[in-house]
């Protein structure tokens, strides 16, 4: 690298530092003083279910007063308690109301009633990366790199706030109208200084240290990034099998095979991200995220332009207007039932 290029890189890294320091101030204000009860169920018209989970659903809703569309996550308090997800749910809301980044879905309102917790988020009509990836088969390397760069920046932001995301997968990445990513579902995200021990995540994306019940840190997110880049570029994940136990055996073995069409730069980056040895895994070394940002596979990436959303997206989802749901699957609809008595008031008092 020439002197001029090195100087440019140095000043970019300095301005990133300044940006993150300011971002942390903003985050901490909201983290310490979380917004509560900023809307009410009656203010929204419920339109259609966009997804379902073990303790709730996500619905497209329309704000009656403004006509704006949102995605409303509805969680059944009693089910959350039964599934021992109280802590995770409180984490999700507390984190979402405090963060602010171009590739993180925005929490617009949150509230609760006798039966449910509600998180009202920006509606991202392009649907999940998962469905586009399965339809197209696999993404070209430039296409995969465009998305990967946004995740790198997002993790750099989250990690600087001591947040581990822990649930990276194509199902949790929505594609917006401009073709950029919106990361959703902070159900497993956690603020951790140092190490944590909870087993959570999706089998194919779990880092070896989580499987081996070791204390782990934010390096698990960089491992998951390696899995995601592999899956985007190959069309299937690097470790798969019928049973989770077989997947886990493959993950901890430290052996990865690459499709012949992967470029040598891509294989090199993935070997450094899918690195079982934490003392060698990119993102976890003394240069931190810069080992990833300065890797040859990202040589053509203009990080600032990606952050500013100035790079032309490789793919724009088709959609026919603000309330269009054609990029989401259909689900059976269900009434939202609200009890006349308060359920689990104590457990969710801080929500």
From Swiss-Prot:
Q: Where in the cell is it found?
A: Cytoplasm; Cell membrane; Membrane; Nucleus
Ranges in coiled-coil conformation:
none
The positions flagged as active site in the entry are 167 (proton acceptor)
User: What tissues express this gene product?
Assistant: Ubiquitously expressed in mammalian tissues.
Q: Where in the sequence is Deamidated asparagine found?
A: 3
Indicate where a lipid (N-myristoyl glycine) is covalently linked. Answer: 2
Phosphoserine sites (modified residues) = 11, 140, 339
Keywords noted in UniProt: ATP-binding, cAMP, Cell membrane, Cytoplasm, Kinase, Lipoprotein, Membrane, Mitochondrion, Myristate, Nucleotide-binding, Nucleus, Phosphoprotein, Serine/threonine-protein kinase, Transferase
Tell me which CDD domains the record gives: STKc_PKA
What GO molecular function terms would the record report? Answer: ATP binding; cAMP-dependent protein kinase activity; protein kinase A regulatory subunit binding; protein serine kinase activity; protein serine/threonine kinase activity
Tell me the SUPFAM superfamilies matching this sequence: Protein kinase-like (PK-like) (SSF56112)
Q: Does the keyword Calcium apply?
A: no
InterPro entries attached to this UniProt entry = AGC-kinase_C, Kinase-like_dom_sf, Prot_kinase_dom, Protein_kinase_ATP_BS, Ser/Thr_kinase_AS, STKc_PKA
E.C. designation(s): 2.7.11.11
Instruction: Name the reaction it catalyses.
Output: L-seryl-[protein] + ATP = O-phospho-L-seryl-[protein] + ADP + H(+); L-threonyl-[protein] + ATP = O-phospho-L-threonyl-[protein] + ADP + H(+)
Assigned GO CC terms: acrosomal vesicle; cAMP-dependent protein kinase complex; cytoplasm; cytosol; germinal vesicle; mitochondrion; nucleus; perinuclear region of cytoplasm
Q: Which GO terms describe its biological process?
A: cellular response to heat; negative regulation of meiotic cell cycle process involved in oocyte maturation; negative regulation of TORC1 signaling; signal transduction
* Notes on activation and inhibition: Allosterically activated by various compounds, including ATP. Activated by cAMP; the nucleotide acts as a dynamic and allosteric activator by coupling the two lobes of apo PKA, enhancing the enzyme dynamics synchronously and priming it for catalysis.
Q: How does it sit in the membrane?
A: Lipid-anchor
Q: Which sequence positions carry the modification called Phosphotyrosine? A: 331
Q: Which family does it belong to?
A: Belongs to the protein kinase superfamily. AGC Ser/Thr protein kinase family. cAMP subfamily.
Cite the record's note on assembly: A number of inactive tetrameric holoenzymes are produced by the combination of homo- or heterodimers of the different regulatory subunits associated with two catalytic subunits. cAMP causes the dissociation of the inactive holoenzyme into a dimer of regulatory subunits bound to four cAMP and two free monomeric catalytic subunits. The cAMP-dependent protein kinase catalytic subunit binds PJA2. Activates cAMP-sensitive PKAI and PKAII holoenzymes by interacting with regulatory subunit (R) of PKA, PRKAR1A/PKR1 and PRKAR2A/PKR2, respectively.
Q: What is this protein called?
A: cAMP-dependent protein kinase catalytic subunit alpha
Q: Which organism is it from?
A: Sus scrofa
